[in-house]
Amino acid sequence: MKYINQDELLNMTTRYRTQVVNSLSGFKSANLIGTSNKEGIHNLAIFSSVVHLGASPALVGFITRPNTVVRHTLENIQQTKQFTINQVNDGFWQAAHQTSARYEAGECEFKQTGLTPLVIEGVGAPFVRESRLKYALKLKEIVPIQLNDTLLVIGEITNILCDKE
């Protein structure tokens, strides 16, 4: 068994250390977070940090990285207070991963990736039609995590769409 102490961990190259630490919590689900800005332009971004926080009320959160660059997903959620979470499946994982590329604020990731937006009346953010399990949330709280300048974005589930399979 390999043993790695904190000094060894800190002396790893940044990229390798990131890969090691990211893998420690095991398998992570891949999810696409759908948002719209005030002009109605859809945004889509992949996240692996989605976590269940409670059932009553039904709360789910995700971690967003520090604001060292423009974060369209976070900006849109702050503006509209709504977002969707769409589980990625084997039918579109490559297109989902493409959402991690850098796009300008006016560019729609749905168009860039070939994924299909699903808009439902009363929900102010797009779903991903290809996703088998998707749900809408309204923003409840954004919690700053001072240790690494990330944010925990917490939403309450308002709608769930699930394939019958």
Q: PLM ranges: what are they?
A:
Residues 1-43, 51-165:
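Active-site-proximal mixed secondary-structure blocks
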